[in-house]
Amino acid sequence: MTDIQEKLKNYISSELEYWDFSGVIRIVKDSTILYETSRGFASIEFGIQNTMETRFEAASVSKQFTAFAIMLLYDKGLLCLDEKANQYLPDSMQIPADITVHQLLCHTSGPHNNYNFEDDFYVGADRMPYDREQFFRDWILKDAGNLSKKKTRNSFNYNNSNYNLLAWIIETVSGQTYSEFMEEHIFSKLGMTQTAIDDGQRILRNKANNYMHDYGVLVRVPYTNSLYSIGAGALVTNCDDLQKWYECLRTKNLLSERAYQIFLSENTNHYCYGLEWYARNSYLHGGDFLGVSAYTHYFFDENLCILLLSNTESLDQYRLGTGIAAILHNGQAPHYYRPEEHLLAPQDLAKYTGTYLPGKIQIEEKNGKLYLVRVNQNIHIELYCVGKDSFIRRYEEQQTPHRLIPDGGGQPSIWGYKRIREPL
């Protein structure tokens, strides 16, 4: 074992044990695996452990594949990136006329973001049977009047809706379903036999279940219909296939040189097409969803990549990935420790409890512990005090505490929402 491998092993092992990680990590240099590990369970119910062959949901790591598919259509002369997106969408699914395909790809188009606190989409409407046109009408086109009034579309606003629309462009232009196109033109050509688009129904063998902490105990995440993540998420894959994908990008396979130049060019806010330009001329994209953490970091000039897939949200994959990259480049990778707990009596916790956004955000006290109630009232996330009016999650890494009462006092608030009702 080389010195670098020993450092990677020691650092990653200490991090994963401290944060109770469940998933897989692989680091590849010059097509050789420098380090890999699998931890935790793919199925807690049946005692099935994760292995390096386990398949995981990849959340927003999916976006780089959608963007690549658009570039395949570009290479075939089937679409122009600077043309209006409406030219490639069905007549019944038209968006404000000035939005281009390029703006969708780099998140500067400005459609409605349905993953917000106020809307009833997240763990609400996205649990229903998938209807493409209804989804478009009710959740993508929402606030279209305000959207049409925008004079410029140069500001960055990361939004899954952009990539939902791109998936529908792929379907319209190709005449195939999004899943069929990805399978025929990307997955099968690269031998990615363990990669698929999850339609929420077909059985994907060796796929890990996703878990979250509810009242401090790991539970299955609430059901959502993965088709509502089309283009923006829904990819299921494993480390072997992601390594094949990295090699495709590194060797510039499947696309023309010109298409790769566009695909990897930095736009607003360091965003390319489905990837972010990062330090050392590298490209990165992660993903987060209910019980899902994913991370891909590519150093093409050095023939180096970092891959992480997890079926819990216990650890900050971006911090860990940055630490791994630091070791690979002879730097220091600091360990992040949970801040010391400041014990509070139940009566002291009570001043934070109540409703902050009806049906969406609530804080409750139970058996001397404070819980943030989220995910449509399904998940109770334990918080503990780390300073005056400051709290963090106990079981998931969180580096910036929730400041529940602002400096100078006032009404309790979280994420900008003031408490509107105290508990009865």
Locate each region found by the language model.
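Non-catalytic beta-strand/loop surface segments
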Residues: 203-204, 208, 212
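Active-site-proximal loop and beta-strand segments within enzyme catalytic domains
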Residues: 21, 29-30, 41-160, 176, ...
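Short, well-structured active-site flanking segments
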Residues: 34, 65, 71-90, 173-201, ...
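Catalytic loop of the DD-peptidase/beta-lactamase superfamily, centered on the K-T-G motif
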Residues: 1-38, 171, 176, 180-183, ...
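Solvent-exposed loop/turn segments at secondary-structure junctions
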Residues: 111-112, 163, 312-314
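Secretory-pathway/luminal and periplasmic proteins that interact with or process carbohydrate-rich
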Residues: 34-35, 92-100, 110-117, 189-199, ...
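Short coil/turn segments at secondary-structure boundaries
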Residues: 27, 116-121, 153-154, 199-201, ...
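Well-ordered alpha-helical segments within folded domains of soluble proteins
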Residues: 66-67, 162-167, 240-244
